[in-house]
Every structure is written in structure tokens, then in C-alpha cells.
UniProtKB/Swiss-Prot annotation:
Any single Gene Ontology cellular-component annotation: plasma membrane
Keywords: Cell membrane, Endosome, Glycoprotein, Ion transport, Membrane, Metal-binding, Signal, Transmembrane, Transmembrane helix, Transport, Ubl conjugation, Zinc, Zinc transport
Primary residence: membrane
Protein name: Zinc transporter ZIP4
Positions that bind Zn(2+) 1: H517, D521, H546, H550
Cited InterPro entries: ZIP, ZIP4_12_EF-hand, ZIP4_N, ZIP_Transporter
Disulfide-bonded cysteines: none
Keyword Transcription regulation in record: no
Function, as annotated: Selective transporter that mediates the uptake of Zn(2+). Plays an essential role for dietary zinc uptake from small intestine. The Zn(2+) uniporter activity is regulated by zinc availability. Also exhibits polyspecific binding and transport of Cu(2+), Cd(2+) and possibly Ni(2+) but at higher concentrations.
Organism: Rattus norvegicus (Rat)
Residues spanning the membrane: 336-356, 375-395, 418-438, 509-528, 537-563, 569-589, 598-618, 628-648
Residue ranges that the UniProt entry lists as topological domain Cytoplasmic: 357-374, 439-508, 564-568, 619-627
């Protein structure tokens, strides 16, 4: 039976501000998942009062800067300048929960952000940073520890406190697993209900982890399993004597201890959520209730040893890459920088006009084009081999040590990721093969015999004649669809612009092929900026360098097909705009760290294909009256592209703004 909206709000308000009755859990989470109802001013005021009462700053009670008007303004994230509504709809409870989490984490800073009008943008950034599972676990653990520090009330020994696994489980039961909005809403429910929080695993968790790693069955550790454990830890030696009796006694002792540990096992200790959490020495001492002043006694050392073993076995601090928050971009910054980079790439299409406006300096244009061609080869191969492949394989480590067991764990997945690189290479091979099969064939080339290349195959050798901006005849050509053919009619001669029947489809095939290519480039740029701004910069540079000669070649090929300058420019620009579609798809989908890795793997295959199968043959097939000058320019571009990407790969961790 559907309750009236006013009655629903009244019941919700009673649950929020009632002091005598028991507060029911999950009321905000249920309201969010139902998509019905809203919070009025009275309900919000009671909610915020309860929230502020849970937080205590160093100088006493914290400022109540999170007002009702501020909360209602979160209901208009796209139009914050408009007057707030009288109620906060249920779908915006996610933003309210994120704002409350920021306030619980750092009340003073959040109040400054509210006064500066930055709360809405910081809420979006906070939700975006919790998207990946690793960031979710670490962020929630740190947040719960901050709540513990700011909470004046101390839980009793018998009280079971809320921890990270419980919040994730409640969010999964309510809707989507590991959704930041649902998890933070579940957290806000517990804050309002007066629950205590535990931001670190219990001591029993570390013992349970070791047993889970060694055996899936609830039994004692056997001698072979203990030997494997000691070998993994790098301790112990060869056993040259029979210790059967000793093993039997040890077996009995461990059985008794393990049965005792099973009695004290909790949900906190059995959850695998903590497996990827890297603990500091301060965290380990906090888990076992040890003060920094007193230090670790011999008795306490025996207690915390399982935590050290667990950290070694889980490789939480060695195999997991450290996330540098300063390198990550917020959602708004990803769209801004990604759009600017893609806009610069798309302007390459407009650059084709310079070929017409600077007809008298066509000699310089020819050599500039050849320099960019070699620079594109260097940038593409350099980005693929020096930056993208190490990132795809997880080799961009920020620690000084690389352990052998870490390399073994990466090995299997690395093979599949490298296979994705080959998949990207093969996909674009198939695309261009089918593209060439659909192209009309020139009758003159058919007379050359079965070994000749297709007549209008868009060969990559782009050689602009210094005399009248034409491409000269080449003995060899590759299959790149977005560069000029190797026929010799002059592009600017009006007599040669008569459309033959077999060329009518050529402009559209060129535009379609380039549109798909640019869409893939946009996906690569979007995934790169979703990772870090440094990866986005490197990928954008590589895409820009190879798009410049491509777009100029497209423009020349469209003119050769008989199109007017205006129409050729429009088609070239339209195909370039598909890069924005790929960019926004990659940014909007929110593929996460694992998805970004696979997209970058496929993009690596694309870069290698374009560089080695298209652009490198273009460099090798060019004939010029000044071969040594051309050789020098090719080397400058090739070595320059490699140098730029090498410096970026070596010193990217030292680059800060």
C-alpha cells in the first residue's frame, strides 16, 4: 500500500528527531533506493542538528555551517545559482550524504568550502574518487577513523561498532554493490542513529587471513603449508631430522588455539574487504590498542606479529600501486582538459586550409609535413612502448623495491593485457582491409597485374609537390585510408575535378574511416585523462602528432576526389568531431581503473599499427630532390618524439603544478 507523501515525510521526520523511540536503521538508504518522498526543511534541520552533535572540533563544538539552505542547494547541482527548493528530493540524498561525509572528515575545511561556494564541486570530486574498489576501502577506512577521532562518545566494550565491510554489505543489499552514494548514505544512517565506528580491522582478522591464504578448509595449518608459508616469507631452512612427536604436540596446540579463535571470529575478521588495505605502523598499533608513548612490549609483539605476516602475504603495500591524489583529476577537470586536448586535435582538420593559403610556400609545407610525419612515428611508438605498455602491465611502480612474488602475481594478467594490445592491432588491420575491399579500383592499376596495389587505396606517402601542391608518383604505397592516393592529377586544376562514377563513394568512405579512427582516438584520450593528467598529456601529444599529417592527407584526398574546398573542409571537420564522442563516452561511462587499463591496451595496439604499418612506410617511400635534408628532418622528428616520451616516462612523478 502506498502511503501519502505527507505521511511519509512525517514518519521520516519522527525517525530522525525522535529521542524517546528507537530509531530504525536504513531510513535514508531506503528513501534513496525507493526514489519516492523527500526531506522538507524541518526534517533537514533535525538531521543536521544530529549530525553536528556527533562532531567535536579541537576547540569545542564545531560550527554548524552545513545549513538547511546549503543542503537544499545540493538538489540543484547543475544550477546552483537558482533559489533552492523547499524540499530535497530523495534522488539527491547521495549529495547530502557526501557533503555530510566531508563535514565528518574535516569540519573546518568543509565550512571554508561552504563559505567559498565550493561544496557542490567538492562533493562531485569526492564521489568520483570513491569509484574504484581500492579507493573505496581506503577512503572509508580513513573516514571512519576521522569520525572516531571527532566523536566524543566512547563505545562500550560490549558494543559492536560499524565497520567498512558492514557498510559495503548494506549498500549491496540496498542496490548496487560498492556504489559510493549508497555506501555514504548507509554511513549517514548510522551516524544519525548514534552508532560507533571502527575504521580498522580487528586483531582476529589477521589470524583468519593467514588461515584463509593457506587453506580453504577450517582446519589447522599442516606441515607442508607451514613450509610454504615460511618459504614465501623468506625464513626457515632445510629440515634434516624427524620431528614427528613435536609436530603432533604442535598440532594439538594449534587445534586448541584455532578452535578458540573461531569462537571469537567476527564479521570484521572474516571479511576480505581489508585484504588490500596497506597499514602503517601507527595503524597496526591502533588495531591492538597500543599507545605510541608506551611502545610495543614483548607480550604485545607476540600479539601484533600476525598483522605483519598478513601485510607480507597480501602484498597490500607492495603490489598495489600508490594512488597519488594530486595526479588524479576531478570529474570536471577531466571533461575540461580532455575537451581542450580534443579540440586542439580537431583543429588539425582546419589546418588543411593552410595548404591553399600558402601555395607559394609549398616547399616549406612539404618539409614541415615530413617532419611531422616522423615526429608522429616517434610519438606513437614512444608513447606505446615507454608509457602505455608499462602502465598497462602495472610496471609504473612508485616504490623502490620490486619483489619476485609480486612479479609472479602480475605475470598471468600481463599476458592477457598484452593480448589486448595485439587485439587492438588486429582490429585496425581488419578495418583497413575491409575498407580497401570496399574502395573502387582504378582501371589503370588493374592493368598493371595482380601484384599491383589497389588504385584508390589512399596510400600513406603524402608528398606535396613544391610546384603546385600535388602528390608525386611513388613506386610503393601502403593501405592507409586517410591519406592521398598516388595518382598524379593536380589537385588545384579545375579540369581534373570531374567526378568519375567509381569515385563518387570515395569521399564518404574516407570520412567514415576517419570518423571511426577519431572515435578510437577520443576513447584513448578519455581513458588517459581518467587515469592521470600525465597519462592524458602523453596520449594527447601522440594523437596530435599523428592526426596532423592524417587530416592534411584527408583534405588532399577529398580535393582529389572532386569536392570543393568548402565541402572537403566540412567533411574533414565532421569526421574529426567524432573524437569528442569517443572522449565523452570514455569519461561518462566511468569504466574505472581496470577498464581504463584495457582501453589503453587496445589504444596501444592502434598506435603501433598506425605508426609501423602506415606512417613508417610513408617515410621510407618518399622521394625528394634533397634526400639528405629529408633524412635529417626524419631523424629530428623520430628522435624528438622518442626523447619527449622518454623524458615524460622517466620524470612524470617529479612533474607537479
Amino acid at each position: 500500500m502506498m502511503l501519502p507523501k505527507s505521511l511519509t515525510q512525517g514518519l521520516l521526520l519522527a525517525m530522525l528527531v525522535g529521542t524517546a523511540a528507537m530509531v530504525q536503521p536504513y531510513h535514508l538508504l531506503s528513501l534513496l533506493t525507493s526514489g519516492q518522498g523527500a526531506l522538507d526543511r524541518t526534517a533537514l534541520d533535525g538531521l543536521l542538528n544530529t549530525l553536528v552533535a556527533r562532531v567535536h572540533c579541537t576547540d569545542g563544538p564545531c560550527e554548524k555551517c552545513l545549513s538547511v539552505e546549503t543542503a537544499l542547494a545540493l538538489g540543484k547541482p547543475d544550477k546552483p545559482q537558482l533559489a533552492p527548493e523547499s524540499v530535497l528530493e530523495s534522488r539527491y540524498i547521495t549529495y547530502l550524504s557526501a557533503a555530510a561525509a566531508l563535514y565528518l572528515n574535516d569540519p573546518e575545511k568543509t565550512c571554508k568550502d561552504i563559505r567559498a561556494g565550493l561544496l557542490a564541486s567538492h562533493v562531485d570530486d569526492y564521489l568520483a574518487k570513491l569509484e574504484s574498489p581500492e579507493a573505496m576501502t581506503l577512503g572509508l577506512s580513513q573516514l571512519l577513523q576521522k569520525i572516531e577521532a571527532h566523536d566524543a562518545s566512547q563505545p562500550t566494550r560490549e558494543e559492536t561498532c560499524v565497520d567498512v565491510p558492514q557498510l559495503l554489505e548494506e549498500a549491496e543489499e540496498a542496490g548496487v554493490s560498492r556504489s559510493p552514494g549508497l555506501v555514504l548514505t548507509a554511513l549517514l544512517d548510522h551516524v544519525l542513529n548514534g552508532s560507533c565506528f571502527q575504521g580498522l580491522p580487528s586483531p582476529q582478522y589477521f589470524v583468519d587471513f593467514v588461515f584463509r591464504q593457506l587453506s580453504s578448509k577450517p582446519r589447522n595449518i599442516t606441515l607442508p603449508e607451514l613450509e610454504d608459508l615460511m618459504h614465501h616469507l623468506g625464513v626457515g631452512g632445510e629440515d634434516h631430522s624427524d620431528h614427528g612427536d613435536h609436530v603432533d604436540h604442535s598440532h594439538l596446540d594449534r587445534e586448541a588455539n584455532h578452535q578458540d579463535s573461531e569462537l571469537h571470529a567476527t564479521h570484521n575478521s572474516s571479511s576480505s574487504v581489508w585484504d588490500t588495505l596497506c597499514l602503517s605502523a601507527k595503524d597496526v598499533m591502533a588495531v591492538y590498542g597500543l599507545s605510541e608513548e608506551a611502545g610495543v612490549s614483548p607480550q604485545a609483539w607476540a600479539q601484533l606479529t600476525p598483522a605483519l605476516v598478513q601485510q607480507q602475504l597480501s602484498e597490500a603495500c607492495s603490489s598495489s600501486p600508490i594512488i597519488h591524489v594530486q595526479d588524479q583529476l576531478s570529474q570536471a577537470e577531466r571533461y575540461l582538459y580532455g575537451s581542450l586536448a580534443t579540440l586542439l586535435i580537431c583543429l588539425c582538420a582546419v589546418f588543411g586550409l593552410l595548404l591553399l593559403t600558402c601555395a607559394k610556400c609549398s616547399t616549406a609545407t612539404h618539409y614541415i609535413m615530413q617532419t611531422f610525419l616522423s615526429l608522429a612515428v616517434g610519438a606513437l611508438t614512444g608513447d606505446a612502448l615507454l608509457h602505455l605498455i608499462p602502465k598497462v602491465l602495472g610496471l609504473h611502480t612508485h616504490s623502490g623495491e620490486v619483489h619476485s612474488h609480486e612479479e609472479e602475481s602480475i605475470g598471468g594478467q600481463s599476458t592477457w593485457r598484452l593480448l589486448a594490445v595485439l587485439g587492438g592491432f588486429y582490429i585496425f588491420f581488419l578495418f583497413e582491409s575491409f575498407f580497401n575491399l570496399l574502395l573502387p579500383r582504378d582501371q589503370d592499376h588493374e592493368k598493371d597485374g595482380p601484384c599491383s596495389h589497389g588504385g584508390h587505396s589512399h596510400g600513406i606517402s603524402l608528398q606535396l609537390s613544391p610546384s603546385n601542391l600535388r602528390q608525386s608518383k611513388q613506386p610503393h604505397e601502403s593501405s592507409r585510408s586517410d591519406l592521398v592516393t598516388e595518382e598524379t592529377p593536380e589537385l588545384l586544376n579545375p579540369d581534373t575535378r570531374r567526378l568519375r562514377a567509381e569515385l563518387r563513394m570515395l569521399p564518404y568512405l574516407i570520412t567514415l574511416g576517419d570518423a571511426v579512427h577519431n572515435f578510437a582516438d577520443g576513447l584513448a584520450v578519455g581513458a588517459a585523462f581518467s587515469s592521470t593528467w600525465k597519462t592524458g598529456l602523453a596520449t594527447s601529444l601522440a594523437v596530435f602528432c599523428h592526426e596532423l599529417p592524417h587530416e592534411l592527407g584527408d583534405f588532399a584526398a577529398l580535393l582529389h576526389a572532386g569536392l570543393t574546398v568548402k565541402r572537403a573542409l566540412l567533411l574533414n571537420l565532421a569526421s574529426a568531431l567524432t573524437a569528442f564522442a569517443g572522449l565523452y563516452v570514455a569519461l561518462a561511462v566511468g569504466v574505472g581503473e581496470e577498464g581504463e587499463t584495457w582501453i589503453l591496451a587496445v589504444a596501444t595496439g592502434l598506435f603501433l599499427y598506425v605508426a609501423l604499418c602506415d606512417m613508417l612506410p610513408a617515410m621510407m617511400n618518399v622521394r625528394d630532390q634533397r634526400p639528405w635534408l629529408l633524412f635529417l628532418l626524419h631523424n629530428v622528428g623520430l628522435l624528438g618524439g622518442w626523447t619527449i616520451l622518454l623524458l615524460l616516462s622517466l620524470y612524470e612523478d617529479s612533474i607537479t603544478f
